[in-house]
Amino acid sequence: MVQQLSLYSVIDEGSFDLLIATISALSGRSPVLFANYNHVAHPNPNYAIEKVNAKNQLVEQTRVQLMQEIPFEKLQTEEYSYKLCTKMTGDGPPIETEYLNSLMRSCGDGTRPWSLSLWDIPSAGKDRKVCTQAVVESVVTSTGGAHSSILSFLAELGYVPGYQFVQLGTQFYLENGIVFQISKLWALHGESGKTSAVTKDGFLIKAYLNVPKATDLESINQGTAHLQQLKRELRDYLELSIPDRKSMDSRVGHLNDF
Amino acid sequence: MSQTSPLSEQADSSLKYDYSNVPAQALDAIRMRLAQLTHSLSKIRDDMSKADLPQWYSLQAQLSVTLTQLSSLTSTLQHFEDTLECTVPYPLPSFPTTAHEGLLTTLMRKKQIPEVENWIKDAIDHSGLDLEGRNWDEIESAIQRDKSTTARALDFINQEYSNYSFQGLYTAEELSKNVGDPQSMIYRSATSNAKPKAPFSVDSILTFMYQGTMKTEETSIAK
């Protein structure tokens, strides 16, 4: 299972330019624009799923995350650079909501591939240096059936639509494989076309690194060291920290849920 | 063992020796400085042989500490030059010469070890001075020349240094022409409060991403 090592932080809008300049100067890399649409689906509550399996082991239901990148031609902007991020102060993303709402129902040859992923709750432990989270990810290139769409595909899997959001920002591909992401999030409120800013007046910072195997302790330790090094380098300017693991729990009906 | 007092006639081990003439103060001062210097030199060597180098600023700090210690050693040696030059060490009769012959030869050794001899020879060769000829005037003038070159280089560096502004947002040229916002001129990188503010918590955003709810508003976006 892929292990994602990560550290998080937040900044206000006024600090964006300085942060971009800082990371560019530190890494010698340039920022890359990215945008994606995310849909999180819940397990269908109508199915009576046993809480324990035949071996008396606990069965935990997890939300599933679908992600599709948004092509740049759909962005309502004149310039395709990180500078776009400084102009995204409104309640909605610079993307047509009709387009976003059509994504889940679109079918046929023109459909772009979806990334389907399941995220485990990050590992517990007091002395953790980074947030370690197991991820299972797969790519859905096409769906079959009479009324083919990603929605029907999810229904077949036993999932019902949940909530959706758009993530837009800029990222740096640092050395050692670390991705340094500065992004904004908007929640989409269904067919009404209403949107609201989740990261109002600020940006979410995520520095992460993926290790292909959980058993590859050497790579995990090395990745942890690289992230620690980045944290040390940015110390006194940006405090990269480990978030509360409960906030990254995608399990349904669990403890702090509902 | 190292003492300048004349040896007593009796070779009795219980005999009290007169240590009063041992230049203990000088030797101890030099010993301490040498210990410091060897410690920092071996630390630098260890750091340099590591797989990933330490940060440049810590290396530079170490180097400057080592240089300070080196100059302090040199000045101490200079200070006790006269005392040390007329000090002759010799073993006391009570010293177990047979058992510790190796130690004794090391301690009594006056000749430099081959490596040291080599670099001293190298340095002399490179200086291009003829020490054999004992032309002291020539050597003196060479040293003077060297000193004046150093002074000139130092002057040059100081002058170049003053040409630039190492703090604030403006160049020295801009500062001398009085361009720019005077408020920004007092900006100092070390004490700047350019730290980003946090308009929301990471946890609240992650809760939304993973569970569809905002901790702050407590309203479910999910149906």
From Swiss-Prot, chain A:
GO terms for biological process: positive regulation of transcription initiation by RNA polymerase II. The lineage of its organism: Eukaryota, Fungi, Dikarya, Ascomycota, Saccharomycotina. Keywords: Activator, Nucleus, Transcription, Transcription regulation. Component of the Mediator complex, a coactivator involved in the regulated transcription of nearly all RNA polymerase II-dependent genes. Mediator functions as a bridge to convey information from gene-specific regulatory proteins to the basal RNA polymerase II transcription machinery. Mediator is recruited to promoters by direct interactions with regulatory proteins and serves as a scaffold for the assembly of a functional preinitiation complex with RNA polymerase II and the general transcription factors. It is found in: Nucleus. It comes from the Eukaryota. The keyword Oxidoreductase does not apply. Signal peptide: none annotated. GO terms for cellular component: core mediator complex; mediator complex. Component of the Mediator complex. InterPro entries: Mediator_Med18. Belongs to the Mediator complex subunit 18 family. It comes from Eremothecium gossypii (strain ATCC 10895 / CBS 109.51 / FGSC 9923 / NRRL Y-1056). This is Mediator of RNA polymerase II transcription subunit 18. The keyword Signal does not apply. GO terms for molecular function: transcription coregulator activity.
Curated annotation (Swiss-Prot), chain B:
Gene3D superfamilies: 1.20.58.1710, 6.10.250.2610. It is found in: Nucleus. One of its GO terms (biological process) is negative regulation of transcription by RNA polymerase II. One of its GO terms (molecular function) is transcription corepressor activity. Coiled coil: none annotated. GO terms for cellular component: core mediator complex; mediator complex. Keywords: Activator, Nucleus, Transcription, Transcription regulation. The keyword Iron does not apply. Component of the Mediator complex. Belongs to the Mediator complex subunit 8 family. PANTHER family: MEDIATOR OF RNA POLYMERASE II TRANSCRIPTION SUBUNIT 8. Component of the Mediator complex, a coactivator involved in the regulated transcription of nearly all RNA polymerase II-dependent genes. Mediator functions as a bridge to convey information from gene-specific regulatory proteins to the basal RNA polymerase II transcription machinery. Mediator is recruited to promoters by direct interactions with regulatory proteins and serves as a scaffold for the assembly of a functional preinitiation complex with RNA polymerase II and the general transcription factors. This is Mediator of RNA polymerase II transcription subunit 8. The gene is MED8.
